[in-house]
Amino acid sequence: MKNIQILFQTLNIFPKNLVLYKQALTHSSYSNEQTPPQEDNERLEFLGDAIVGLLMADYLYSQSKEDEGIMTKKRAQAVCEKSLTIYAQKIELQNYLLLGKGEKNKDFNAKGIMADTFEALFGAIYLDLGYLTAKKVFHNIVLPHLAKTIYIIDFKTQLQEIVQSEKKTIQYKIVQEQGPAHSKNFVAEVYLEKNLLGTGEGSTKKSAEQKAAQQALSKVAKTKDLIKNKGVKEKEL
């Protein structure tokens, strides 16, 4: 096990309660081998799971105007076990982990141990140094690798990029709204000038627009021809 002070230097933090960090780095397999048993990281993992999810939700909400569905999918991918393991490896968290003899020779990445430890670490940082410090550390670790862990397709952005490459603009129009206030259904259409590119339905206006953009992209060759003014039947607004 490396000197934990090196980890603190990597994270650029100045801890007040070292006991919390030792606990965060103590796997239950190690704890059970001690006499008396030491407190393991499972409770901090529980707290850290919520903190990590909140930090990612906070970031996604502040950085975009995407609808709830897209942000939910992005958050799920960004803080899934595989992604958390990647973040843990980037700070070499495995070098500080206290593992029992039976676990040391196993692939603890595959078992989710590193992901759990990453969450426990953020539980410790939150309790010791507060939300703002946890947020700063989280951003420093996660944001450089976010593009590799999020694979959500934003159809509106894709369509917009195609249109902008031809120096054109598109317009979304909500053409239908049905249902009670608690269970609305919307129909959206996306136009290039007077040409209908796609139609979509959704429980929110933004999700309907995403579906409309997706339909336009599914006919990408025809859409590109339209954008380049090669002649496609028009529908009047």
UniProtKB/Swiss-Prot annotation:
SUPFAM superfamilies: dsRNA-binding domain-like, RNase III domain-like. Gene3D superfamilies: 3.30.160.20, Ribonuclease III domain. Its EC number is 3.1.26.3. Residues 154-222 form the DRBM domain. It is found in: Cytoplasm. Its cofactor is Mg(2+). GO terms for biological process: mRNA processing; regulation of gene expression; rRNA processing; tRNA processing. Keywords: Cytoplasm, Endonuclease, Hydrolase, Magnesium, Metal-binding, mRNA processing, Nuclease, RNA-binding, rRNA processing, rRNA-binding, tRNA processing. The active site is at 49, 119. Homodimer. NCBIfam families: RNaseIII (TIGR02191). This is Ribonuclease 3. The lineage of its organism: Bacteria, Bacillati, Mycoplasmatota, Mollicutes, Acholeplasmatales. The gene is rnc.
